[in-house]
C-alpha cells in the first residue's frame, strides 16, 4: 500500500495514524478533518501526516480511505468524493452500526465502487487526537462485514491491514453485527446515559448533593456516559430496531428484579445475581478484561 487517507483525526483516526506510522504500513498518511480544533491539535502533536484542505486531494492521492467520522457524515463525504473514486480504491470505516450506514453508502456511492465496512471493537469515553494511542487496536477484535457483493480482494486486504494494526479479525454479516452490538455495546451505553440522567433528576428533586458520593457504581457509569454525544446519537438512530428490542429485554428483567426486591424473594434474586456474576468470569477468561480491581483509570 502506498498512501492512506484518514477522514476524521479524532481518537480512532489519530490512533490509526500512530500505528500506521510506527509499523511503516503506508508511504504517506493523508488526513482530512473539518474540525479546525482537531487539525490544530494534530499539528501541535506533530503527527506524521499530510493535512489536506480538500477531500478530493486526499482521495486522488490515496489507495486506502478510512472514514473515522460520525456516521451521519458518511453521505456528504461520499457525495463529495464520488467523482474522484475508482475501482482501485479500498474504502472502509470504523462505525459501530452497519445496516443503516451501509444502506446509505450504497445508495449514494457511484457504480462499480466497493464499500467494505470495518468495526474495530475499541475506543474510549474521551475524544480528540491528543488521546490517540498507537496500541489502541492491539489484541482487540475487528469485525469485517461480508455481504453478497463484497469484493473479496478488498476484504482480504482489510483483514491483513487490521492484523497489522494488532487486531483479531472476525467476519460476519451486518445483520448479525447489529444484533450482537445492540446488547454488548449500544444498550450498556444507553443504560449509562439513563442512569446518570436518573441521578441528576433525583438530585434535583430531593435537593441532595449526590455527585460527591460517586465513588462506586455511578462513577463507573458516568465514564461511559461521557462518550461523544454525536457519535452515540448516530448509533442509537441507526440501530434503533435492534436497540428497541434490547430495551424491551432490559425492562422485562428490571421489572423482575423489582418484583423480587419488593417480595423479598431470596431464592430468585440470589439466583439472578449468581448467574450474572458468572458473565464477568467468562469475560476475563476470554481475555476481554483483566482480573484486577478497577478503582479508577490510569
Describe the predicted segments one by one:
Residues 3, 28, 114, 141, ...:
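Residues at the starts of beta-strands that form the adenosine-phosphate
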Residues 56-85, 89-90:
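Rossmann-like NAD(P)-binding element
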Residues 134-220:
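Internal alpha-helical scaffold of NAD(P)-dependent oxidoreductase catalytic cores
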Residues 207-275:
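Interdomain hinge/lid region at the active-site interface
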Amino acid at each position: 500500500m502506498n498512501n492512506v487517507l484518514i477522514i476524521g483525526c479524532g481518537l480512532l483516526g489519530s490512533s490509526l495514524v500512530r500505528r500506521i506510522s510506527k509499523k511503516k504500513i503506508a508511504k504517506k498518511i493523508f488526513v482530512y478533518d473539518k474540525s479546525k480544533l482537531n487539525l490544530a491539535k494534530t499539528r501541535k502533536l506533530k503527527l506524521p501526516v499530510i493535512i489536506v484542505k480538500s477531500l478530493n486531494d486526499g482521495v486522488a492521492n490515496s489507495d486506502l480511505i478510512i472514514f473515522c467520522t460520525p456516521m451521519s457524515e458518511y453521505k456528504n463525504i461520499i457525495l463529495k468524493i464520488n467523482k474522484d473514486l475508482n475501482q482501485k480504491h479500498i474504502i472502509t470505516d470504523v462505525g459501530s452500526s452497519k445496516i443503516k450506514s451501509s444502506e446509505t453508502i450504497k445508495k449514494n456511492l457511484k457504480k462499480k465502487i466497493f464499500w467494505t465496512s470495518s468495526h474495530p471493537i475499541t475506543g474510549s469515553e474521551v475524544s480528540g487526537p491528543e488521546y490517540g494511542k498507537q496500541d489502541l487496536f492491539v489484541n482487540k477484535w475487528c469485525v469485517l462485514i461480508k455481504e453478497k457483493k463484497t469484493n473479496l480482494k478488498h476484504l482480504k486486504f482489510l483483514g491483513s491491514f487490521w492484523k497489522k494494526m494488532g487486531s483479531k479479525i472476525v467476519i460476519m454479516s451486518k445483520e448479525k453485527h447489529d444484533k450482537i452490538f445492540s446488547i454488548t455495546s449500544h444498550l450498556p451505553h444507553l443504560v449509562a446515559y439513563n442512569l446518570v440522567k436518573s441521578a441528576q433528576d433525583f438530585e434535583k428533586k430531593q435537593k441532595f448533593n449526590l455527585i460527591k458520593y460517586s465513588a462506586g457504581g455511578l462513577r463507573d457509569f458516568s465514564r461511559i456516559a461521557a462518550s461523544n454525544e454525536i457519535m452515540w446519537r448516530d448509533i442509537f438512530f441507526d440501530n434503533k430496531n435492534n436497540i428497541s428490542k434490547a430495551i424491551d429485554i432490559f425492562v422485562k428483567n428490571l421489572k423482575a428484579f423489582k418484583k423480587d426486591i419488593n417480595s423479598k424473594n431470596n431464592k430468585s434474586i440470589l439466583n439472578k445475581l449468581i448467574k450474572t456474576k458468572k458473565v464477568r468470569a467468562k469475560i476475563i477468561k476470554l481475555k476481554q478484561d483483566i482480573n484486577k480491581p478497577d478503582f479508577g483509570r490510569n
